[in-house]
């Protein structure tokens, strides 16, 4: 009986060592981390890109491009998913740019459109100032001064004081990992594509 008990305890202790390291959240965070190692010039200008799977040149991008490129590591093409959802229900998306129909070149690169998409197809979570409510892989949106929208991905790493999760984002200096979760008013908090792709 003692041998079975020791074997069972040994198995339970070592089982996490054999867990699948390729969980979606791990893939997303690894992709976001990799983005921080690539120099990117902040440029949100309109560009014609391929569809599906289109992207602006690798050396340019904005906050949404960090998210879009990171999700591609999960096999999730937000360009295609946002475009198809906008084609299905254009009125469910903000009318902020004078558009009369979806545009696969730019729609997925606009934070308000991503907010609408994640509300419709992901989990919408609380936007409280409780750092424990923000899990690694969550998406957070903010409104910067001048009501400018911004988006980032919650990291596993914590602030120097251990109080807040760090954020992968691009606010103008290229993709960064920074302690900025509560620096601006939070407009959205979402979880998307981390259990199984919808």
Stretches found by the model and what they are:
Residues 20-41:
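N-terminal hydrophobic or amphipathic helices/low-complexity stretches enriched
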Residues 21, 49-58, 100-104, 125-129, ...:
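Second-shell loop/turn segments in exported
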Residues 1-7:
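Bacterial N-terminal signal peptides that target proteins for export
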Residues 33, 37, 68-76, 83, ...:
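Sec-exported extracytoplasmic/periplasmic mature domains
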Residues 162-198:
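Low-complexity, Gly/Ser/Thr/Pro-rich intrinsically disordered linker/tail segments
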Residues 24, 29, 87-168:
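...with weaker cross-activation on analogous glycine-rich loops/strands in unrelated enzymes
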Residues 44-64, 77-101:
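Acidic helix-start/capping segments at beta-turn-to-alpha-helix junctions
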Residues 14-19:
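N-terminal signal peptide c-region/cleavage motif recognized by signal peptidases
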């Amino acid at each position: 009986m003692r041998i079975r008990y020791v074997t069972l305890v040994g198995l339970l202790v070592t089982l996490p060592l054999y867990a699948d390291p390729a969980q979606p959240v791990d893939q997303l965070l690894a992709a976001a981390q990799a983005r921080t190692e690539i120099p990117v010039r902040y440029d949100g200008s309109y560009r014609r890109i391929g569809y599906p799977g289109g992207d602006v040149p690798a050396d340019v991008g904005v906050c949404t491009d960090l998210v879009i490129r990171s999700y591609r590591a999960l096999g999730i093409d937000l360009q295609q998913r946002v475009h198809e959802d906008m084609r299905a229900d254009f009125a469910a998306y903000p009318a902020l740019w004078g558009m009369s129909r979806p545009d696969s070149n730019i729609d997925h690169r606009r934070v308000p459109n991503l907010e609408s998409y994640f509300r419709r197809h992901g989990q919408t979570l609380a936007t409280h100032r409780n750092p424990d409510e923000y899990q690694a892989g969550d998406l957070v949106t903010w409104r910067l001064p001048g009501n400018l929208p911004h988006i980032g991905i919650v990291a596993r790493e914590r602030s120097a004081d251990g109080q807040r999760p760090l954020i992968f984002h691009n606010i103008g200096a290229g993709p960064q990992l920074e302690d900025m979760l509560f620096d601006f008013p939070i407009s959205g908090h979402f979880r998307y594509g981390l259990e199984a792709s919808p």
